[in-house]
Amino acid sequence: MVLRLSKLFLRTLREDPADAEVASHRLLVRAGYIRRAAPGIYTWLPLGLSVLRKVEKVIREEMAAIGAQEVHFPALLPKEPYEATNRWTEYGEGIFRLKDRKGGDYLLAPTHEEMFTLLVKDLYSSYKDLPLSIYQIQNKYRDEARPRAGLLRGREFIMKDSYSFDVDDAGLDASYNAHRAAYLKIFERLGLEVIPVAATAGAMGGSRSEEFLHPTEIGEDTFVRSAGGYAANVEAVTTVVPAEIDFSNAPAAEIRDTPNTPTIDTLVDAANQLVPRDENDGGAWTAADTLKNVVLAVTLPTGERQIVVIGVPGDRGVDLKRVEANIGAYLPVAGEITVEAAGEEDLARNPLIVRGYLGPGMSLGTPLLGLEGAAKLLYLVDPRVVKGTAWVTGANMAGKHVFGLVAGRDFGWDGVIECTEVRAGDEAPDGSGPLETARGIEMGHIFQLGRKYAEALELKVLDQNGKQVVVTMGSYGVGVTRAVAALAESNHDAKGLVWPRAVAPADVHVVAVGRGEEIFAAAEQLSLELEAAGLEVIYDDRPKVSPGVKFGDAELIGVPTILAVGRGLVDGVVEIKDRRSGEAENVAVEKAVDYVVNAVRSK
C-alpha cells in the first residue's frame, strides 16, 4: 500500500504541544499520530492507528500461540456484577458511573474480571471444558485525578486482558507460566525492553503477581534488582528481618527531658549529649537507634478518612506507595485507597497525638493507644521492629522522649507492614546481593487470582468425581496504547520518532525532492515497485512543499528507511538513509528496490 502525503489525513506541527510533559507525548502529537480530545483522552489518526494495529497484531499472534481465544465485551457495563464482588464500592471515585433513563446504574469498564467470569459460568459446567484462556483487546476507562504524560496515564486507554480458567492450582500454574512466556515474546517482537519483577496484587486480589516494567527515567514505578537475579517492584520488596533479641536482662526504659527536639536530627544530637555512648555500648547514637512514629491519613473507597500511625526506624523514610500496597489487610473494607501524611485537621481531631514527641502505645508516660476514653488508633510497625529491639522514641508528652523502650516488653503493635523506602545497597531478600534501584513504566501485569472472583460469582464446574468445585482463575493484562507510548519514548532522537520495523507505520518513506516532473515520475515509479515487492510505503508527493520541510517531516514521522529522489537522479542514483543510524548511501535507481527490500527483511 502507498500512502500519499498529498492525500493522507495528516498535519505535522513545528511546535511542541503546551501540555506535553514527556517526549512520547510531544512527538506523537507533533508527528500527527494522535490528537488530544480532552484531558487524558486522545483521538487516533491514520498513522497512529497503523502503529496501534501492528502492536495488536503481535499480541494476537502470541495469544493464539498459547491457545487463547479472542472475545469482545462491551465497554458499558451493568452495576450488578460489580456489586457482587464489592468492587462497585471498592473503586470509589476511580471509575465513571452513569445512569440510564430508567435510573439503572452502569459504569464504563475499568476492567472486566466479572464479565469474563459470568460468561464462562453461563457456558461451561464441566472440568472437561477446562483449561480455557480467553482474551479481548478493548477500551478501558479510569477517572484519573491527574491524567499525565499523554498516552502513559490517560482516562481512556486500550488493554489486552486475558483470563485463564482451570480446575486446580496446578492448572493455574501452567496457564500463568504460558502467559508469562507469551508476554516475553510479545515485548521481544515489539523491540521493547522489559524486566519481569515481583509485584503486589493490589485491588485485583490473588496471590502470585508479576509486572513487566520498561526501564526509563520517566517511569512511575520504582523497582529494584540485584546482580544475582532478584527483581521486584518496591511495593513488593520484603525486608530482611533481624532476629529477635532476648530482653530478659534489658534495663528499664527511662523518660528524659528533651526540649526542642521535634525532629530525628535534633533528637540524635540531644541523645549524644544526654546519654553519651562509647564503642562498647554501640557507639554514638544515630537515627537508626530511634523509632519514628509517622501519622498517616488513609482515605477508604467509601470516602471515610482513617488515621493510622506507623513506627519505623528513624533513618528510614516512609514510602506511601508501599503503604498503599500493603495496608489493605488491616483496613475494614477492601479496594483502592489513598494514603497521605496527616494534615492539620486530622491532627486536631486526635489531641492525644503530640507532634514531634509521638510514641507507640506503652505503659510509660501518657499512652497513645488503649488510653481509657480515647479512640484506639491503628498502630503498625516496620519489620525491623522485632521483639527485644530497644529504641529512643517519643514519650507522648511535649519535650520528652523515652530511652531504651523495648519492643515486645514495653509496647506492642497491631501488625507489621512493609512501608519504608527501599534503598540502593539494601540486601536482596533472597540473599542474592545488594539492590540497585531504577524506574520503569508498567507494560504488563499478570496475576494468579485464585478463586476470589469465581467464589463471589459462583463459577463452579463438576470435577472428575461429579463434585462441584470452584474454578481457579488467572488475569493477564498488557497496556496496548501504553506500549505505543513506551516505544515512542524509547525510540526517538532530537529530530523525531525512530520506530522499530515491527511497528513502524510503513517500511519506507519516499521523498520527491525538487519540482521537476522526472523526479516525481521516478519517485512514483519507485513507490509502486516497492509496494509490488510487498512493502508498505509512505510517499511524500506534495508538489509545493520545500525539501527542508519534507525531510523534516520524514525524520519526525520516523519510518526506518527514507528514500530520497532528487538531484542525483541525473546521475542515475537515489539516496537511501537509515533513520536510526543516520547513515546514507547513494544507490543506483535500478537497484533501489532490492536494496530497500533487503534492508527491511534483514532486520
Curated annotation (Swiss-Prot):
Species annotation: Arthrobacter sp. (strain FB24)
NCBIfam families: PRK09194.1, proS_fam_II
SUPFAM superfamilies referenced in this protein's UniProt entry, alphabetically: Class II aaRS ABD-related, Class II aaRS and biotin synthetases
Subunit-structure text: Homodimer.
Sorted UniProt keywords: Aminoacyl-tRNA synthetase, ATP-binding, Cytoplasm, Ligase, Nucleotide-binding, Protein biosynthesis
Domain remarks in the Swiss-Prot or TrEMBL record: Consists of three domains: the N-terminal catalytic domain, the editing domain and the C-terminal anticodon-binding domain.
Primary localization class, coarse: cytoplasm
The protein, known as: Proline--tRNA ligase
InterPro entries: aa-tRNA-synt_IIb, aa-tRNA-synth_II, aa-tRNA-synth_II/BPL/LPL, Anticodon-bd, Anticodon-bd_dom_sf, Pro-tRNA-ligase_IIa, Pro-tRNA-synth_IIa_bac-type, Pro-tRNA-Synthase_IIa_type1
